[in-house]
Design a protein with these regions (language model features):
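Membrane-embedded alpha-helical bundles of multi-pass transporters/translocases
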Residues: 1-201
Length: 201
């Protein structure tokens, strides 16, 4: 479950970090939604992108406690994460502005992941085998390769993704589809994705 979580969340995270402006521009860059609105919204999306793996992992890691009928620990961790989020947001809102909200959300969630990881290792609830660590490295490597392809794709279609282009969403969809295909092929070649594991009986 950890591998599957990272398999989906790591490329999604890098994709949002790299192409946040193009995504917001393609989806909402029309009419009264100005370039300034696109810039501000994409900045927030970028910071949320940093937290995507944590958002995914924290749900997976909490299940190790739920499976043992331990609901108290996840509750207190969630309470701490929310409290930390609020404290960071209120402490820096005047200096940083609205952008502190996605920043604090990502930071606090990653702290929650670290707490879960520490406790799971302490109680020996989670033992990462070498094969899992190896696959995690492969996932990250595949996602990094995907990021390079995405960067070159955005650069190549820069004019087509311009704010004033009415068909920018189509070009972005093409880029995303191509990049996702490259990522899946890379994962398959590295042995992360195995078709036999996804056959429907």
């Amino acid at each position: 479950s950890i591998e599957l979580s990272l398999l989906l969340s790591v490329p999604a995270s890098l994709g949002l970090i790299i192409a946040s402006e193009e995504i917001i521009n393609a989806l909402f860059g029309y009419g009264s939604f100005s370039k300034e609105n696109v810039s501000m919204t994409s900045e927030a999306l970028t910071w949320f992108g940093y937290g995507i793996p944590a958002f995914s992992l924290i749900k997976v890691l909490s299940n190790f406690f739920f499976a043992r009928n331990n609901t108290t620990t996840p509750f207190y961790i969630s309470l701490f994460v929310v409290t930390l989020n609020v404290i960071i947001s209120l402490s820096f809102f005047k200096e940083v502005g609205f952008i502190i909200i996605p920043i604090s959300t990502s930071i606090s969630t990653w702290v929650g992941v670290l707490i879960y990881t520490y406790l799971l290792n302490r109680y020996s609830f989670l033992i990462l085998q070498k094969s899992i660590i190896k696959n995690i490295f492969k996932i990250i490597s595949s996602a990094v390769l995907m990021s390079f392809v995405l960067l070159h794709g955005l650069e190549y279609f820069e004019e087509s993704l311009n704010f004033v282009n009415k068909f920018k969403a189509i070009y972005l969809l093409f880029i995303v589809s191509f990049v996702a295909t490259i990522y899946l092929i890379t994962c398959y070649l590295l042995g992360i994705l195995k078709i036999k594991n996804y056959k429907i009986n």
